[in-house]
Amino acid sequence: YRGLTQDSDPLSTWTTKVQRTKAGGGYHQWHYEDGQFLYRDRVLAWMVYLNDIPTDNGGGTDFLHQKLTLQPKEGTIVLWPASYTHVHRGGFLTGEIPKFIATGWFIREPGQSIREVL
């Protein structure tokens, strides 16, 4: 991913969110992860599906430009660029099974060269 090679600032991930989504819940608006000034240092987003959700129960992660829906499967790790190239949303969950995910971001740590870290 080009965003990793544009400069020599190291990346870190220090925020992890564990989420439980019930039927009808979730974040259904199309969005991308570095779209606000506060989040401008996000380079990559990551998510781990913590349980399986049957396809007929919805709850997948939709990626707009890729025309792709990823259905939750326990243990699956998803990693994507935080930029506008990967607009996404949480699909509507319709069944009785709640969806569990862990999610976070790789953040650029400006001001410290990656060479200093190595």
Regions found by a protein language model. Name each.
Residues 1-77, 85-118:
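Fe(II)/2-oxoglutarate oxygenase catalytic core
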